[in-house]
Amino acid sequence: MTSRPRTAARLAAAVLALATGASCAPSPRTCLTLVPEPPADKDTVQVVFLGVGGLIVRWQGAAVMAAPLYSNPTIGEIALSEIHPDRQRIDALLRQDIAGVGAIFSGHAHYDHLMDVPYVALHKAEHADLVGNNAMVKLLEPIRRRLEPRQELVSLESPNPPVYEVPGAQIRIRSVASLHSPQMGPHLVGWLGRLLINFPRVTLWRGEDEDPAKELPVRAGNWTAGTTQAFVIELLDAGGDVAFRIYYQDSPTVAPYGYPDWPNNPNRYELAILCLGGATEYKTFPGDIVRYLAPAYVMGIHWENFFDPRPLPTPGATGVKQRIDYAPGVKEGKFLGRVRDAQPAGGRAIVPCPDQVATFRKDASGWRLVDDKGWSKRR
């Protein structure tokens, strides 16, 4: 049995590593948040970044959602107390209409992806199936009876089929076996930290329990990741052909993990949604995955310091300016530079603010941004 002093020492080391990484982080970014989402045209693809790993994809009057996080427990709360969905903060910050969302998907089952999902699914997206891996299904077992019969828990991990057709929507989701990057390591702590300690790569909360949970977890470490997945999201036309293809990941990866159809990509990708947080130990990311997918557009997500809860806004406030810290180790400029070096000619990239919307419309030359504010210039 681990002694309390030893546990405290390990926790202190982890917090020190994160703090050291944070101390080297760029200055906070000023974002315009709580921007009302414009109505979605049926013939456009609308992608709304919700913050952390969350987003909404709208197509032909239907929508799917990547698991959002608004509760954002602090490091102190994670270490010293139970953690629970902050319903007040979710209600205040999740302004988008998600009543028509057909599925909420998550690539792994850590708390920063799944903790808020039960409340969102049961009270806001009441027709959405919950799609993920086997660990997600086990951890959310305690709410199964409340979800059924309108909603289901769906695993796309083996031995289950890896493809999910969203009911009543021209949207298909395909899982790709991936892995979770180390949250901490020598490149996060920097050269000074490496002089003081031989810091190993640390991947927190790996694996999964054998049996379904009897209660929803209330400790961060009990939200175990399971087998991490990436997703290919295919938006289909009336004939069932792919009109717009999206790659989504909620953890950085290295080849061949998370690379669809490895080693030869046969498909065109209009948009790749890539995770910035946790990428410090992967020197070839994101260049390798961008070269492999050759997407016309790249969106970087999970860049914020999610240990810092967003402030509660004044009721009804819109267009609120907010200073948001980067997650430890995240360097937006370096990420965008590597993306640009790897993208095909004409490619564009962005690291969006929470509530920012990207709308794509097709013309004779292909899919184009309706409003390109904040996007990089064409490569």
Describe the function of each predicted region.
Residues 210-293:
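Active-site-proximal loop/helix segments of hydrolase catalytic cores
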Residues 115-125, 142-143, 311:
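Metal-dependent catalytic neighborhoods of phosphoester/phosphodiester hydrolases
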